[in-house]
Amino acid sequence: MQEYFRIEDIMSRKLVHTPEGVRDIYGDEKAKKTVVEHLLHEKIKGYGYRDIQTPTFEFFDVFSKEVGTTPSKELYKFFDKEGNTLVLRPDFTPSIARCAAKYFMEENVPIRFCYQGNTFTNTSDLQGKLKEVTQMGAELIGDGSVQADAEMIAMTIEALYHAGLSDFQISVGNLEYFKGICAEAGLDEETELELREYISGKNYFGAEELLDRTHVNRKDKEQLLKVSELFGTSAILAEAKKAVSNNRSKNAIDRLEKVYQVLCDYGVEKYVSFDLGMLSKYNYYTGIIFKGYTYGVGDAIVKGGRYDNLLRRFGKNAPAIGFVIVVDDLLAAMSRQEVVISGIESYVKIYYTSEDFKEMLQEARQLRAAGKNVELLPRSRENGEVK
Protein backbone atom coordinates (compact mmCIF):
# COMPACT_ATOMS: atom_id res chain seq x y z
CA MET A 1 0.00 0.00 0.00
CA GLN A 2 2.84 2.33 0.88
CA GLU A 3 4.50 1.59 -2.46
CA TYR A 4 1.25 2.41 -4.31
CA PHE A 5 1.11 5.86 -2.70
CA ARG A 6 4.80 6.39 -3.47
CA ILE A 7 4.24 5.63 -7.18
CA GLU A 8 1.15 7.83 -7.21
CA ASP A 9 3.14 10.64 -5.58
CA ILE A 10 5.88 10.34 -8.23
CA MET A 11 3.28 10.41 -10.99
CA SER A 12 1.60 13.47 -9.48
CA ARG A 13 4.91 15.33 -9.29
CA LYS A 14 5.62 14.48 -12.93
CA LEU A 15 2.20 15.68 -14.07
CA VAL A 16 2.68 19.19 -12.70
CA HIS A 17 5.78 19.78 -14.86
CA THR A 18 5.70 21.07 -18.44
CA PRO A 19 7.63 19.52 -21.35
CA GLU A 20 11.07 20.91 -22.21
CA GLY A 21 10.85 24.20 -24.09
CA VAL A 22 7.44 25.39 -22.86
CA ARG A 23 6.46 27.09 -19.63
CA ASP A 24 3.65 28.60 -17.58
CA ILE A 25 3.34 32.38 -17.31
CA TYR A 26 1.32 33.79 -14.42
CA GLY A 27 1.11 36.51 -11.78
CA ASP A 28 3.13 39.69 -12.28
CA GLU A 29 4.97 38.27 -15.28
CA LYS A 30 1.72 37.65 -17.16
CA ALA A 31 0.41 41.08 -16.14
CA LYS A 32 3.56 42.73 -17.55
CA LYS A 33 3.30 40.68 -20.73
CA THR A 34 -0.30 41.82 -21.24
CA VAL A 35 0.70 45.48 -20.82
CA VAL A 36 3.64 45.21 -23.23
CA GLU A 37 1.52 43.42 -25.84
CA HIS A 38 -1.09 46.17 -25.57
CA LEU A 39 1.52 48.91 -26.01
CA LEU A 40 3.09 47.22 -29.05
CA HIS A 41 -0.32 46.64 -30.61
CA GLU A 42 -1.36 50.23 -29.92
CA LYS A 43 1.58 51.64 -31.87
CA ILE A 44 1.22 49.20 -34.79
CA LYS A 45 -2.51 49.91 -35.11
CA GLY A 46 -1.66 53.61 -35.14
CA TYR A 47 0.01 53.02 -38.51
CA GLY A 48 -3.24 51.73 -39.97
CA TYR A 49 -2.66 47.99 -39.54
CA ARG A 50 -5.72 45.81 -39.01
CA ASP A 51 -5.90 42.66 -36.91
CA ILE A 52 -5.92 39.27 -38.57
CA GLN A 53 -6.11 35.81 -37.00
CA THR A 54 -4.90 32.69 -38.80
CA PRO A 55 -5.14 29.04 -37.64
CA THR A 56 -2.69 27.65 -35.10
CA PHE A 57 -2.10 24.72 -37.46
CA GLU A 58 -2.03 24.57 -41.26
CA PHE A 59 -1.41 22.05 -44.04
CA PHE A 60 2.22 20.97 -44.23
CA ASP A 61 2.64 22.49 -47.71
CA VAL A 62 2.19 26.02 -46.31
CA PHE A 63 5.52 25.61 -44.47
CA SER A 64 7.28 23.19 -46.83
CA LYS A 65 10.89 23.46 -47.98
CA GLU A 66 9.75 24.97 -51.29
CA VAL A 67 8.26 27.94 -49.43
CA GLY A 68 11.63 28.54 -47.77
CA THR A 69 10.47 28.51 -44.17
CA THR A 70 11.48 26.41 -41.12
CA PRO A 71 13.31 23.10 -41.83
CA SER A 72 11.00 20.06 -41.77
CA LYS A 73 12.82 18.48 -38.82
CA GLU A 74 11.95 21.53 -36.68
CA LEU A 75 8.21 21.36 -37.41
CA TYR A 76 5.60 19.84 -35.09
CA LYS A 77 3.76 17.54 -37.50
CA PHE A 78 0.64 15.44 -36.99
CA PHE A 79 -2.20 13.91 -39.02
CA ASP A 80 -5.93 14.50 -39.20
CA LYS A 81 -8.50 11.72 -39.67
CA GLU A 82 -8.27 12.03 -43.46
CA GLY A 83 -4.51 11.45 -43.38
CA ASN A 84 -3.49 15.04 -44.20
CA THR A 85 -0.18 16.16 -42.70
CA LEU A 86 -0.73 19.21 -40.51
CA VAL A 87 1.80 21.50 -38.84
CA LEU A 88 1.71 23.79 -35.81
CA ARG A 89 2.74 27.15 -37.24
CA PRO A 90 6.47 27.85 -36.76
CA ASP A 91 6.20 31.24 -38.46
CA PHE A 92 3.33 33.64 -39.16
CA THR A 93 4.43 35.03 -42.53
CA PRO A 94 3.50 32.06 -44.80
CA SER A 95 0.08 31.87 -43.10
CA ILE A 96 -0.54 35.58 -43.71
CA ALA A 97 0.61 35.20 -47.33
CA ARG A 98 -1.81 32.28 -47.84
CA CYS A 99 -4.65 34.26 -46.27
CA ALA A 100 -3.94 37.35 -48.40
CA ALA A 101 -3.89 35.25 -51.57
CA LYS A 102 -7.21 33.62 -50.64
CA TYR A 103 -9.24 36.66 -49.62
CA PHE A 104 -7.49 39.59 -51.33
CA MET A 105 -6.54 38.10 -54.70
CA GLU A 106 -7.93 41.02 -56.71
CA GLU A 107 -6.84 43.82 -54.34
CA ASN A 108 -4.41 46.22 -55.99
CA VAL A 109 -4.03 48.66 -53.10
CA PRO A 110 -1.63 48.01 -50.19
CA ILE A 111 -3.01 45.73 -47.45
CA ARG A 112 -1.87 46.16 -43.85
CA PHE A 113 -2.23 43.30 -41.36
CA CYS A 114 -1.12 42.94 -37.75
CA TYR A 115 -1.32 39.85 -35.58
CA GLN A 116 -0.39 38.26 -32.29
CA GLY A 117 -0.08 34.63 -31.25
CA ASN A 118 2.23 31.74 -30.46
CA THR A 119 4.61 29.93 -32.79
CA PHE A 120 6.04 26.44 -32.30
CA THR A 121 9.51 25.21 -33.28
CA ASN A 122 10.82 21.75 -32.45
CA THR A 123 14.39 22.73 -31.66
CA SER A 124 16.85 20.54 -29.77
CA ASP A 125 16.56 20.53 -25.97
CA LEU A 126 20.32 21.15 -25.89
CA GLN A 127 19.84 24.61 -27.41
CA GLY A 128 17.96 25.73 -24.30
CA LYS A 129 15.47 27.76 -26.34
CA LEU A 130 11.73 28.06 -25.87
CA LYS A 131 9.83 25.92 -28.35
CA GLU A 132 6.68 27.98 -27.96
CA VAL A 133 6.99 31.76 -28.10
CA THR A 134 4.58 34.67 -28.42
CA GLN A 135 5.08 36.90 -31.43
CA MET A 136 3.51 40.17 -32.46
CA GLY A 137 3.99 41.36 -36.00
CA ALA A 138 2.80 43.22 -39.05
CA GLU A 139 2.77 42.64 -42.80
CA LEU A 140 2.46 45.24 -45.58
CA ILE A 141 1.35 43.55 -48.81
CA GLY A 142 1.21 45.18 -52.23
CA ASP A 143 3.79 47.94 -51.72
CA GLY A 144 7.33 47.44 -53.00
CA SER A 145 8.51 50.99 -52.35
CA VAL A 146 11.41 52.37 -50.35
CA GLN A 147 8.81 54.13 -48.20
CA ALA A 148 7.25 50.76 -47.30
CA ASP A 149 10.66 49.42 -46.21
CA ALA A 150 11.24 52.49 -44.06
CA GLU A 151 7.72 52.39 -42.59
CA MET A 152 8.27 48.86 -41.32
CA ILE A 153 11.60 49.69 -39.70
CA ALA A 154 10.37 52.99 -38.22
CA MET A 155 7.22 51.33 -36.89
CA THR A 156 9.33 48.63 -35.24
CA ILE A 157 11.49 51.25 -33.54
CA GLU A 158 8.50 53.28 -32.35
CA ALA A 159 6.71 50.16 -31.07
CA LEU A 160 9.71 49.02 -29.01
CA TYR A 161 10.19 52.51 -27.59
CA HIS A 162 6.46 52.81 -26.82
CA ALA A 163 6.64 49.52 -24.92
CA GLY A 164 9.37 50.96 -22.67
CA LEU A 165 12.61 49.78 -24.30
CA SER A 166 15.09 52.56 -25.08
CA ASP A 167 18.46 50.84 -25.45
CA PHE A 168 18.27 48.84 -28.68
CA GLN A 169 19.50 48.81 -32.26
CA ILE A 170 17.87 47.81 -35.54
CA SER A 171 20.42 46.30 -37.90
CA VAL A 172 19.48 46.52 -41.59
CA GLY A 173 20.85 44.58 -44.54
CA ASN A 174 19.93 43.70 -48.11
CA LEU A 175 20.13 40.10 -49.36
CA GLU A 176 20.49 41.39 -52.92
CA TYR A 177 24.02 42.55 -52.06
CA PHE A 178 25.11 39.01 -51.22
CA LYS A 179 23.11 37.48 -54.08
CA GLY A 180 24.79 39.83 -56.56
CA ILE A 181 28.25 38.63 -55.52
CA CYS A 182 27.09 34.98 -55.63
CA ALA A 183 25.72 35.45 -59.16
CA GLU A 184 28.95 37.11 -60.29
CA ALA A 185 30.91 34.19 -58.81
CA GLY A 186 28.73 31.71 -60.74
CA LEU A 187 27.32 29.95 -57.67
CA ASP A 188 24.17 27.89 -58.16
CA GLU A 189 21.20 28.25 -55.79
CA GLU A 190 22.08 25.19 -53.71
CA THR A 191 25.66 26.35 -53.13
CA GLU A 192 24.45 29.87 -52.34
CA LEU A 193 22.07 28.54 -49.67
CA GLU A 194 24.83 26.40 -48.16
CA LEU A 195 27.17 29.40 -48.10
CA ARG A 196 24.45 31.51 -46.46
CA GLU A 197 24.15 28.94 -43.68
CA TYR A 198 27.89 28.97 -43.05
CA ILE A 199 28.17 32.77 -43.01
CA SER A 200 25.02 33.37 -40.92
CA GLY A 201 26.28 30.71 -38.48
CA LYS A 202 29.69 32.46 -38.29
CA ASN A 203 31.34 29.29 -39.66
CA TYR A 204 33.91 31.03 -41.84
CA PHE A 205 36.15 27.96 -42.14
CA GLY A 206 33.22 26.03 -43.59
CA ALA A 207 32.45 28.94 -45.95
CA GLU A 208 36.06 29.11 -47.17
CA GLU A 209 36.21 25.35 -47.68
CA LEU A 210 32.97 25.44 -49.70
CA LEU A 211 34.29 28.22 -51.94
CA ASP A 212 37.53 26.29 -52.49
CA ARG A 213 35.55 23.17 -53.43
CA THR A 214 33.51 25.11 -55.98
CA HIS A 215 36.67 26.71 -57.47
CA VAL A 216 35.53 30.30 -56.98
CA ASN A 217 38.19 32.74 -58.16
CA ARG A 218 40.21 34.68 -55.63
CA LYS A 219 38.50 38.04 -56.16
CA ASP A 220 34.95 36.67 -55.74
CA LYS A 221 36.03 34.54 -52.79
CA GLU A 222 37.45 37.59 -51.00
CA GLN A 223 34.27 39.58 -51.68
CA LEU A 224 32.03 36.80 -50.36
CA LEU A 225 34.08 36.34 -47.20
CA LYS A 226 34.35 40.11 -46.67
CA VAL A 227 30.54 40.47 -46.53
CA SER A 228 30.50 39.52 -42.84
CA GLU A 229 32.88 42.42 -42.06
CA LEU A 230 30.64 45.07 -43.63
CA PHE A 231 28.65 46.34 -40.67
CA GLY A 232 28.36 49.61 -38.78
CA THR A 233 26.86 53.06 -39.25
CA SER A 234 25.56 54.45 -42.54
CA ALA A 235 29.19 55.21 -43.46
CA ILE A 236 29.71 51.49 -44.16
CA LEU A 237 27.41 51.71 -47.20
CA ALA A 238 29.94 53.67 -49.26
CA GLU A 239 32.64 51.13 -48.40
CA ALA A 240 30.32 48.25 -49.33
CA LYS A 241 29.57 49.82 -52.71
CA LYS A 242 33.29 50.27 -53.48
CA ALA A 243 33.95 46.62 -52.60
CA VAL A 244 31.85 45.27 -55.50
CA SER A 245 31.70 45.72 -59.26
CA ASN A 246 28.37 44.07 -60.15
CA ASN A 247 25.26 46.22 -60.62
CA ARG A 248 22.97 43.98 -58.55
CA SER A 249 25.01 44.54 -55.40
CA LYS A 250 25.45 48.25 -56.14
CA ASN A 251 21.68 48.62 -56.58
CA ALA A 252 21.21 46.91 -53.20
CA ILE A 253 23.35 49.61 -51.58
CA ASP A 254 21.43 52.34 -53.43
CA ARG A 255 18.23 50.92 -51.94
CA LEU A 256 19.67 50.94 -48.42
CA GLU A 257 20.81 54.54 -48.83
CA LYS A 258 17.31 55.59 -49.91
CA VAL A 259 15.71 53.71 -47.01
CA TYR A 260 18.11 55.42 -44.61
CA GLN A 261 17.12 58.85 -45.95
CA VAL A 262 13.45 58.11 -45.27
CA LEU A 263 14.32 56.82 -41.79
CA CYS A 264 16.03 60.16 -41.19
CA ASP A 265 12.74 61.82 -42.15
CA TYR A 266 11.08 59.70 -39.45
CA GLY A 267 13.75 60.85 -36.98
CA VAL A 268 14.74 57.32 -35.91
CA GLU A 269 18.18 57.10 -37.52
CA LYS A 270 20.02 56.86 -34.18
CA TYR A 271 18.51 53.39 -33.70
CA VAL A 272 19.64 52.16 -37.13
CA SER A 273 22.85 50.41 -38.16
CA PHE A 274 23.76 48.31 -41.21
CA ASP A 275 25.01 44.76 -41.71
CA LEU A 276 25.62 43.43 -45.22
CA GLY A 277 26.46 40.01 -43.77
CA MET A 278 22.97 39.57 -42.30
CA LEU A 279 21.55 36.45 -43.97
CA SER A 280 18.27 34.95 -42.75
CA LYS A 281 17.54 31.23 -42.39
CA TYR A 282 14.20 31.91 -44.10
CA ASN A 283 14.77 31.53 -47.84
CA TYR A 284 11.66 33.48 -48.79
CA TYR A 285 13.32 36.82 -47.99
CA THR A 286 14.30 38.68 -51.17
CA GLY A 287 15.74 42.11 -50.38
CA ILE A 288 15.73 44.39 -47.34
CA ILE A 289 16.14 42.42 -44.14
CA PHE A 290 16.43 43.66 -40.56
CA LYS A 291 16.83 42.46 -36.98
CA GLY A 292 16.49 44.16 -33.61
CA TYR A 293 18.99 43.66 -30.81
CA THR A 294 19.24 44.74 -27.19
CA TYR A 295 21.34 43.61 -24.27
CA GLY A 296 20.03 40.98 -21.86
CA VAL A 297 19.16 38.37 -24.49
CA GLY A 298 21.38 36.63 -27.02
CA ASP A 299 18.94 36.36 -29.92
CA ALA A 300 17.32 39.09 -31.99
CA ILE A 301 14.08 40.40 -30.47
CA VAL A 302 12.90 41.56 -33.91
CA LYS A 303 13.14 39.76 -37.25
CA GLY A 304 11.81 41.15 -40.50
CA GLY A 305 12.32 41.70 -44.17
CA ARG A 306 10.98 41.83 -47.70
CA TYR A 307 9.52 38.70 -49.33
CA ASP A 308 8.40 39.77 -52.80
CA ASN A 309 8.04 36.24 -54.22
CA LEU A 310 6.29 34.40 -51.39
CA LEU A 311 2.71 35.31 -52.29
CA ARG A 312 3.28 33.97 -55.80
CA ARG A 313 3.52 30.53 -54.19
CA PHE A 314 -0.14 30.95 -53.18
CA GLY A 315 -1.28 32.41 -56.50
CA LYS A 316 -1.01 36.18 -55.87
CA ASN A 317 1.77 38.21 -57.44
CA ALA A 318 2.48 41.04 -54.99
CA PRO A 319 5.50 42.49 -53.15
CA ALA A 320 5.42 42.34 -49.36
CA ILE A 321 7.42 43.19 -46.26
CA GLY A 322 6.87 42.33 -42.60
CA PHE A 323 8.37 41.80 -39.17
CA VAL A 324 7.78 40.01 -35.88
CA ILE A 325 8.66 41.06 -32.35
CA VAL A 326 9.44 38.08 -30.12
CA VAL A 327 7.49 39.19 -27.05
CA ASP A 328 9.04 36.65 -24.66
CA ASP A 329 12.58 37.77 -25.53
CA LEU A 330 11.57 41.43 -25.32
CA LEU A 331 10.18 40.88 -21.82
CA ALA A 332 13.31 38.99 -20.74
CA ALA A 333 15.47 41.88 -21.94
CA MET A 334 13.30 44.47 -20.20
CA SER A 335 13.47 42.48 -16.98
CA ARG A 336 17.27 42.22 -17.09
CA GLN A 337 17.55 45.92 -17.91
CA GLU A 338 15.21 46.65 -14.98
CA VAL A 339 12.80 48.55 -17.20
CA VAL A 340 9.76 49.62 -15.17
CA ILE A 341 6.54 48.49 -16.85
CA SER A 342 3.76 50.79 -15.75
CA GLY A 343 0.05 50.41 -16.30
CA ILE A 344 -0.35 47.03 -14.62
CA GLU A 345 -3.89 46.73 -13.32
CA SER A 346 -4.39 46.65 -9.56
CA TYR A 347 -6.95 44.59 -7.67
CA VAL A 348 -9.22 45.65 -4.82
CA LYS A 349 -10.05 43.12 -2.11
CA ILE A 350 -13.35 43.33 -0.24
CA TYR A 351 -13.96 40.99 2.69
CA TYR A 352 -17.40 39.94 3.88
CA THR A 353 -19.12 37.97 6.63
CA SER A 354 -22.46 36.21 6.39
CA GLU A 355 -24.06 39.23 8.08
CA ASP A 356 -22.75 41.93 5.71
CA PHE A 357 -22.43 39.94 2.46
CA LYS A 358 -25.23 41.83 0.67
CA GLU A 359 -23.72 45.20 1.58
CA MET A 360 -20.20 44.15 0.50
CA LEU A 361 -21.58 42.67 -2.73
CA GLN A 362 -23.21 46.00 -3.57
CA GLU A 363 -19.94 47.82 -2.92
CA ALA A 364 -18.07 45.36 -5.16
CA ARG A 365 -20.61 45.80 -7.96
CA GLN A 366 -20.30 49.58 -7.81
CA LEU A 367 -16.51 49.39 -8.04
CA ARG A 368 -16.66 46.91 -10.94
CA ALA A 369 -19.08 49.21 -12.77
CA ALA A 370 -16.46 51.95 -12.33
CA GLY A 371 -13.88 49.72 -14.05
CA LYS A 372 -12.11 48.37 -10.96
CA ASN A 373 -10.97 44.77 -10.54
CA VAL A 374 -12.57 43.49 -7.34
CA GLU A 375 -12.11 40.26 -5.40
CA LEU A 376 -14.89 39.38 -2.97
CA LEU A 377 -13.45 37.24 -0.17
CA PRO A 378 -14.79 35.69 3.04
CA ARG A 379 -13.44 37.38 6.17
CA SER A 380 -11.44 35.09 8.45
CA ARG A 381 -9.47 35.41 11.64
CA GLU A 382 -6.32 35.72 9.56
CA ASN A 383 -7.46 38.69 7.50
CA GLY A 384 -9.23 40.39 10.40
CA GLU A 385 -11.28 43.51 9.77
CA VAL A 386 -9.61 44.54 6.51
CA LYS A 387 -11.98 45.45 3.66
Q: PLM features: what roles do these ranges have?
A:
Residues F5-P94, A150, S171:
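TRNA-binding/sensing appendages of the translation machinery
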Residues A148, L160, D167-I170, C182-Y204:
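Internal, well-ordered alpha/beta segment that forms a basic, Gly-enriched binding/recognition surface
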